[in-house]
């Protein structure tokens, strides 16, 4: 007997499809967002150390104390706010689990949730499984800025949650402090929560650095901020993330977390805590690290017929291929992989409504040689 699907429209993600296609055709994989280089040697050594020391049993449900303390210190350093170690920080099995737990905890059947398209593909299924209704606000290229009048018009008595993402995947734009002020002005008199997906917080090239919801005194009282150590330390396979939220929200989120995963890899948590404490220069220097790769890739693509859109954060570039082909973006990405040998992601998969723009996403979290080889192929188009 085959059960009725709760998510009938969903299949294998485009990221899995394109990575498989890239492997099949031995293409340079700039589609899925992972590095082709390893993370810090010190972090690997600390993981091995903690395994050898016997830290191989369940961690506390909320995360090991050393890591929660390190997160609190980093948050205070960067955003001027020190969350309570015991009641406001929860370590999760990657950022995606944190997003799912937050949505499940906050969204009730019939609630409306606002997100901004293009958007990360895990939001919609989580909202659907919680019984909520997703209302999407389309952001327009090339700058993908929020129209706050349009946002205010989208609010209703049913609005329960706003999901934002900064630095933004896939558009590579970032929110400014003025955006958070505008968000607060729009929701201050309403019972609306905020889920701020900040997994690329340390890959921000904007003047003044990353603007976090945690730096806004009023918003953080009703917000969940989510981040990812996989992005920060080039270790996406470790799947360790965390969220910061007020105690009352964290308590509800933890009820979901304890029955999703209960706890997270113990030696990895301890190794990350060591890394944050002993080598904070890693995340402080990360913007410069990725800016160098971004600039190298953009310069190498200059002779191509691709139009590169502004990149203020993340490790993704958007490229307009309208001067090259009339194909839709999904077909173009498949052709690019099979015939040119470079795998990319079509922007339309991040949107529910028809996406008329000819844009693809390219990941530059790669070694310089990989980026130059990909650029050589793309410049031949």
Model-derived segments and their meaning:
Residues 105-127:
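Conserved PLP-anchoring active-site segment centered on the Schiff-base-forming lysine
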Residues 3-94, 101, 275-278:
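N-terminal small-domain helix-loop-helix segment of the aminotransferase-like
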Residues 273, 289-298, 308-321, 355:
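Conserved glycine-rich beta-strand-loop-beta hairpin in the small C-terminal domain of fold type I
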Residues 215, 220-291, 295, 299-300, ...:
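Conserved core segment of the aminotransferase class I/II
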Residues 139-207:
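Active-site phosphate-binding strand-loop segment of PLP-dependent enzymes
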Residues 132, 189-192, 220-221:
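A short helix->loop->beta-strand "cap" motif at the edges of active sites that frequently abuts
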Residues 129-135:
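A short helix-loop-beta submotif of the ANL/AMP-binding
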